[in-house]
Regions:
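Short, acidic, small-residue-rich periplasmic hinge/interaction motif at the N-terminus
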Residues: 34, 48, 83-87, 101-141, ...
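A short, solvent-exposed loop/turn motif at the edges and junctions
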Residues: 52-55, 79-93
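N-terminal periplasmic accessory domains that precede
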Residues: 101-107, 121, 147-150, 166-169, ...
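Outer-membrane beta-barrel signature, preferentially recognizing the C-terminal barrel domain
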Residues: 516-518, 528-577, 584, 602-614, ...
C-alpha cells in the first residue's frame, strides 16, 4: 500500500515538473484501462510514458472509471506502459503526432496467480463457472485475417469452420449461436471482425437457459476505439467454376459512437448428379415396383446478398446500445434438390423425368439492444427484434415416356412471416463468485401461406411463445454448480384449431476441477420442442405420381431429456477433451409413410421415442507453441428410432483430424472431417466427407491464400430409407466440389489514430507497481 502511494505521488509530482518546465503547447494522451476478462474499468492502474529510447517522461494513475490523461511536449515514437498488480503489463506504441491522441481501450490480461474464481490453463484459457474465456495470443491475432480465421486458429473443441458453406457448425447439426459483445450475430458479422479488435472469445459448451436450445455459444468481445476507422474486404473464389464468397466492412469511430456498414455475398453455379434406387411395396396386392433413376448433370444456382448497417454507442463499465438493420435476399433459380435422368421400372427403361424446384426470399430485420451495468455488479439487458420474411417456392415434376407426358405436377407456395421478439435479462454477481440470472422472452409470429396446385388454398397461422427462466450458479472451492428452471407458454392458432400448453425446462450443471489441468463436468437438462409451422400445414403437396405429403394439425409438443458428461486434461503441449452426449426424445415428431388411396403418403406424427448417443474425444498437440497445432478427433454415434410401426438402429465410427501451422508471415491449414451420419425416422442421412487444405501469406494489410476442397477424396452424399413400404437409396456427387481449387484474398486499411498493444513478457523498466 505504501509503495503504491509513493509511486502515485512520484508520478504526480514528476508530471507537474515535466509539464510546466517550459512555456510550450502540450500534447494530451488519454485512454481507458479495462479488464480483458470482464471489460470492467481498472482503477489506480499505473500508466507511464516513455520516449523512443526508453527514457521516462511522465506517469499517472487511472481514475475510478479507468480513464487517464498524460501531458507531454511532443510525441516522437513514444510509448506507454500500463500495469496493475495481478495483471500482465501492456505496452502501447503511440507513433509520431503533434495533436492530442486517444488510445483504444487498453485491456489488461489477468495473471494466473491473482485469479481465485477461475482455473487457468497454459494456453491463455480461463475456465470460469459457466464458460471458457480464451485470450488470443499476439501470434494468433497477427496470423489471423478475420474473426472467422481466428476462430479456426483457436481450434476449439467440436466446432467446424465451414468457409465454403459460410457456417460455423457442429458435426451433429446442433445449433451454434454466434454473438458479438453478447448480441446474436451471423457468420458474415464475424467474418467482418478484425482480429486486432478482439479482446477475448467466450466459449460456452453447455450454454445456460438464456440461450435456448443452442449446444454451443461463441461470444466475441471486442474493444471500442475512440477515433479512426477501418475498411476491409475479402474475396473467396474458385476461378474455374461458379463459386464465390465476398465480404466488405467499413467502420468509423468517434468518441463513444461507432458506425458500421458491412455486406456479404455468395454465388453458386455448380453441377450435381444423383442416382437412386427404390421399391414400392403395395399392401393392396399389386406387384411390387422396382424403380431406378440414373441422373445426369443438373445445375444448382444461388445468389445471396446481405448488407447490414449498424450504430453503437457505449461506455465501458456503464452502458451499451446498438441498433442494426439487415437486409437478406436469396434467389435460387435452380435448387439443390433438382434432378434429371432416365427412369427404369423393373430394370426396363421406361422414360425420363425432371424435378425442378426454385425459390427466393427476402428478409429485412431490425435489432435493438441495450445493456446497462448497475451498482453492486448488476446488469440489465433489453433486446427487441422485428423481422419480416417473404418466401416464394415452385415445384415441378414431369415424367415422360418418349414424347408422351405421363406425369405433370406443378405447384407454388408463397408465404409471408412476421416476427416480433422481446427479451429482458437481469444478472447479479455476488462477492463470493455466485451469479443469479433471470429473463423473460416473448416471441410472436404470424404466418400466411398461399398454396396453389389446381386451386388456391390460404392458411393463416399464429404462434406465440413466452419463456420465463431463472438460473443460479456458484463456485465452492474446486466444485462448481448451476441450477435453473424455465417455464414456457406456447399458444398456437390455425383456423378453428387453438392450443395453449405449458412446458417446463429444469437444468443442472456440475463441474469439478481436480487440479488446474484436469476437470470433469456433468449436465442434465429437460426441454420441449414445438411443432414447426411447416409440419402443421394441412395442404396436400404432390411429389410425383406415386407420392404426396401433407402436414398434421394434431401434432403435440414433445420433451427432450439430455445428459452430457465431459472431461478434460491439459499439460504443456498436450490436451484431451472427452464428451459423451445422450439425448432421449419422448413422443418426438417424425415422418411416417402410409398407403392411402393407391398412393404413398408422408405425414408427421408423434412417434414412440428417439435415442441418440454420441462420444467424441479431441486430442490436441502443440509441439511448437502458437506455431504448430495438430488435432485428432475419434468418435462414435449410436441411434435408436422407435416409430409407431417401426424400430431401427444404426452405429457409426468416425475419425477427423486438423493441423494449423504458421511461420513468420506464412500459414498452413488442413482440415479433414469424416462424414457425420444422422439417422432419424426411417432414413439414414449420410454426411459429407470434407477436406480443406490451404496455404497463405499475410502482411499487416494484405493476405492471400490458395487452397483446395476435397483434394484427397471425391465429394458425395448418400442416404438410405429403411421403410417397409418404400425402401430406397440415393447417392449425390459432384465433380465441381471434388479437387476444387480456390484463392482467398483480403485487404484492410485502418485510418485515423491507431495504436498497437503488446503484452510484455519481461518488464525491466522498474517503478511500475508490479
Amino acid at each position: 500500500m505504501r509503495t503504491g502511494l509513493f509511486l502515485s505521488s512520484f508520478f504526480f509530482f514528476f508530471s507537474i515538473i515535466s509539464t510546466y518546465a517550459g512555456n510550450v503547447e502540450l500534447i494530451k494522451v488519454t485512454g481507458k484501462v479495462i479488464d480483458a476478462l470482464e471489460s470492467k474499468p481498472i482503477e489506480f492502474a499505473n500508466i507511464a510514458l516513455y520516449s523512443a529510447d526508453s527514457v521516462f517522461v511522465s506517469g499517472v494513475n487511472s481514475d475510478e472509471k479507468g480513464n487517464f490523461s498524460i501531458n507531454c511536449n511532443d510525441l516522437k515514437n513514444h510509448y506507454l506502459t500500463v500495469s496493475y498488480l495481478g495483471y500482465e503489463t501492456q505496452k502501447v506504441e503511440l507513433g509520431i503526432s503533434k495533436n492530442n491522441v486517444r488510445t483504444h481501450d487498453i485491456a489488461l490480461r489477468p495473471s494466473s496467480v491473482q485469479l481465485k474464481d477461475v482455473v487457468v490453463t497454459a494456453d491463455g484459457t480461463f475456465k470460469k463457472i459457466d464458460r471458457d474465456v480464451i485470450l488470443p495470443s499476439e501470434i494468433q491475432l497477427k496470423t489471423s485475417t478475420s474473426g472467422i480465421n481466428l476462430l479456426q486458429n483457436l481450434s476449439l473443441p467440436r466446432l467446424i469452420i465451414d468457409q465454403v458453406n459460410n457456417s460455423i457448425k457442429l458435426a451433429n447439426g446442433g445449433e451454434v449461436q454466434i454473438r458479438i459483445n453478447g448480441i446474436l450475430s451471423e457468420f458474415a458479422d464475424v467474418q467482418a471482425l478484425q482480429p486486432g479488435d478482439i479482446i477475448r472469445v467466450e466459449y460456452h459448451d453447455s450454454p445456460g437457459l438464456r440461450y435456448g436450445n443452442a449446444e454451443i455459444v461463441v461470444d466475441f468481445i471486442t474493444r471500442h476505439k475512440q477515433s479512426g476507422g477501418s475498411v476491409n474486404a475479402e474475396l473467396h473464389t474458385n476461378p474455374f467454376n461458379g463459386f464465390t464468397n465476398g465480404s466488405f466492412n467499413l467502420k468509423f469511430n468517434h468518441k463513444r459512437s461507432e458506425f458500421a456498414l458491412s455486406g456479404f455475398t455468395s454465388h453458386r453455379d455448380l453441377d450435381f448428379m444423383r442416382k437412386s434406387e427404390e421399391s414400392f411395396v403395395f399392401p393392396d396386392g399389386k406387384p411390387a415396383l422396382s424403380r431406378r433413376i440414373d441422373g445426369e448433370k443438373t445445375p444448382f444456382m444461388q445468389f445471396y446478398i446481405s448488407p447490414k448497417l449498424t450504430y453503437s454507442f457505449r461506455e465501458a463499465g456503464k452502458y451499451f446500445f446498438t441498433a442494426s438493420f439487415r437486409w437478406a435476399s436469396n434467389n435460387s433459380p435452380y435448387a439443390y434438390q433438382d434432378v434429371k435422368g432416365d427412369v427404369y421400372n423393373n430394370d426396363e427403361l421406361t422414360g425420363n423425368m425432371y424435378r425442378h424446384d426454385k425459390f427466393r426470399f427476402k428478409m429485412p430485420l431490425l435489432d435493438l439492444y441495450y445493456q446497462r451495468e448497475l451498482k453492486n455488479k448488476q446488469i440489465i439487458i433489453l433486446n427487441a427484434v422485428g423481422r419480416f420474411q417473404e418466401y416464394k417456392e415452385t415445384h415441378s415434376y414431369k415424367e415422360r415416356r418418349g414424347n408422351e407426358l405421363m406425369t405433370d405436377i406443378f405447384y407454388t407456395e408463397d408465404s409471408k412471416r412476421y416476427w416480433m421478439i422481446l427479451e429482458g435479462i437481469y444478472e447479479k454477481n455476488f462477492q463470493n463468485g455466485a451469479k443469479l440470472s433471470a429473463g423473460l422472452k416473448h416471441t410472436q409470429m404470424y404466418n400466411e401461406i398461399d398454396n396453389k396446385e389446381k386451386e388456391l388454398i390460404t392458411v393463416g397461422q399464429n404462434q406465440a411463445e413466452s419463456y420465463l427462466y431463472t438460473e443460479f450458479q456458484q463456485k465452492l472451492g474446486k466444485f462448481n454448480y448451476s441450477v435453473g428452471i424455465g417455464v414456457s407458454r406456447n399458444d398456437y392458432r390455425q383456423g378453428d384449431v387453438k392450443e395453449i400448453k405449458f412446458t417446463y425446462r429444469p437444468s443442472l450443471k456440475i463441474n469439478y476441477n481436480f487440479t488446474d489441468n484436469i476437470y470433469a463436468r456433468y449436465n442434465v437438462s429437460v426441454y420441449n420442442r414445438t411443432p414447426s409451422i411447416y409440419s402443421m400445414n394441412p395442404v396436400v403437396q404432390n411429389i410425383d405420381s406415386l407420392r404426396f405429403r401433407r402436414g398434421n394439425t394434431n401434432l403435440d409438443t414433445y420433451m427432450t431429456y439430455q445428459q452430457v458428461l465431459s472431461a478434460g486434461f491439459k499439460k504443456s503441449f498436450f490436451s484431451a477433451d472427452l464428451r459423451i452426449d445422450h439425448r432421449y426424445q419422448d413422443k418426438p415428431i417424425m415422418n411416417q409413410l402410409d398407403y392411402v388411396d393407391g398412393r404413398f403418403m408422408t405425414q408427421p406424427y408423434n412417434q414412440k421415442a428417439f435415442h441418440h448417443l454420441q462420444g467424441e474425444l479431441t486430442l490436441k498437440f502443440e509441439p511448437i507453441k502458437n506455431r504448430l497445432t495438430v488435432g485428432f478427433v475419434p468418435g462414435i454415434l449410436r441411434y435408436i428410432s422407435e416409430g409407431n410401426n417401426y424400430t431401427h438402429t444404426y452405429t457409426q465410427w468416425r475419425f477427423s483430424a486438423f493441423l494449423n501451422a504458421n511461420y513468420k508471415k506464412w500459414m498452413l491449414n488442413i482440415q479433414l472431417w469424416d462424414r457425420y451420419d444422422y439417422f432419424q425416422e426411417e432414413t439414414l442421412y449420410g454426411g459429407e466427407t470434407w477436406q480443406d487444405v490451404n496455404i497463405g501469406y499475410k502482411t499487416d494489410r494484405f493476405s492471400i491464400f490458395a487452397g483446395m476442397i476435397n483434394p484427397f477424396k471425391d465429394w458425395n452424399m448418400k442416404s438410405h430409407n429403411w421403410s417397409a413400404l418404400n425402401p430406397s437409396s440415393s447417392n449425390t456427387f459432384s465433380n465441381n466440389v471434388s479437387q476444387m481449387p480456390y484463392i482467398k484474398i483480403s485487404y484492410n486499411i485502418s485510418f485515423g489514430r491507431q495504436f498497437k498493444s503488446v503484452a510484455r513478457k519481461v518488464d525491466n523498466t522498474g517503478g511500475e507497481g508490479k
